[in-house]
Amino acid sequence: MDDILVTSDLTSRYKISRKTLWSWQSADTMPRGFVCPFPPPDWPGNPNRWRSESIKEWEDKKKIN
């Protein structure tokens, strides 16, 4: 079974605010140097939840080489 990450796990992991996390979901507001926006939650709700595998895939392809 995949590990599940919630919003607070991700804000701690990347040392960002919740607002920054949500702004990363748009290609228009993503920082330069990233090739793709942050993935939407696998399970929206309160709290939002992501599969760790979804986050790992994003981490593997997020940076321009």
Curated annotation (Swiss-Prot):
Domain of life: Viruses
One record GO biological process: DNA recombination
Composition-biased stretches (Basic and acidic residues): 50-65
Region spans: Disordered: 45-65
GO molecular function: DNA binding
Keywords: DNA recombination, DNA-binding, Viral genome excision
Function: Excisionase and integrase are necessary for the excision of prophage from the host genome by site-specific recombination at the att site.
Name the record gives this protein: Excisionase
